[in-house]
Amino acid sequence: MFDWLLEPLQFEFMQNALLTALIVSIICALLSCYLVLKGWSLMGDAISHAVLPGIVLAYLAGIPLAIGAFFSGIFCSLGVGYLKENSRIKEDTAMGIVFSGMFAIGLVMFTKIQTEEHLTHILFGNVLGVSHQELIQSAVISAIIFCLIVFKRKDFLLYCFDPSHARVAGLSPKILHYGLLILLALTIVSTMQVVGVILVVAMLIAPGITALTLTKSFDKMLWVAIASSIASSLIGVILSYHFDASTGACIILLQAAFFVIALAYSKIRIR
């Protein structure tokens, strides 16, 4: 059994993959708890699709894809905020049209590019092909996100529960709103190499809802989310190696399985 688990570690590309999955899983789990409490499941899905045009433009310009993805996500988030504040359109409606339009633009640009192999990995993930440089990039981005979440943990928590209460407490809901959006965009940039922009929303939601099903306090929710996210990511990478399956799909399937188990356990515990 141990030989089966340790066999992938003899290869450098698997070491990079496991480290990247570990780093990204922790950040996704932390942010997932806030997104679930805030009800931003659609926001994570929307931004993950909206980064595609930025990725294509960055590829054409010869700059790091992460830069294009980040600014594309932020641009669309600001666009949704502008529509919400300056029209009668509700936020979820604005997200639907803006981010779907951006993804469509990205797909059109994507199909016109001659060399598509690397960009295909961005769509569906390719953690087994992560280079040492990409590992460092994910680690740096994740460290920034981790520090910001820990530093503003209570402020974000208060904002997610009650923006009006946050305003009374002397905080700026608008700053916290866009701050959370920036963290979300950064997390998507860091995660897209693992599962791709299409499946990244699952990593941003599944750990949080699994933990919410099992716990009643936010601190416990964070720990359970981190544990389930790490377990699904590491086991998913190992399973994908042995069964020659899509790594991103294996990770997401395990997270879905953990949620089903958690939901069943919570129902049994209530009885």
Swiss-Prot record:
Q: What is its main location?
A: membrane
- Please list the GO biological process terms of this entry: iron ion transport; response to zinc ion; transmembrane transport
Membrane topology (UniProt):
Multi-pass membrane protein
Task: Return the GO cellular component terms, semicolon-separated.
Answer: ATP-binding cassette (ABC) transporter complex; plasma membrane
Keywords attached to this entry: Cell inner membrane, Cell membrane, Ion transport, Iron, Iron transport, Membrane, Transmembrane, Transmembrane helix, Transport
Transmembrane feature ranges: 17-37, 55-75, 93-113, 131-151, 168-188, 194-214, 221-241, 245-265
Give the location in the cell.
Answer: Cell inner membrane
Note the InterPro entries from the entry: ABC_BtuC-like, ABC_TroCD
- A UniProt-annotated Pfam family: ABC-3
Q: Which CDD domains match?
A: TM_ABC_iron-siderophores_like
Q: Superkingdom of this entry's organism?
A: Bacteria
Q: What does this protein do?
A: Part of an ATP-driven transport system HI_0359/HI_0360/HI_0361/HI_0362 for iron.
Q: What name does this protein carry? A: Probable iron transport system membrane protein HI_0359
The species is: Haemophilus influenzae (strain ATCC 51907 / DSM 11121 / KW20 / Rd)
The opening ranks of the lineage are: Bacteria, Pseudomonadati, Pseudomonadota, Gammaproteobacteria, Pasteurellales
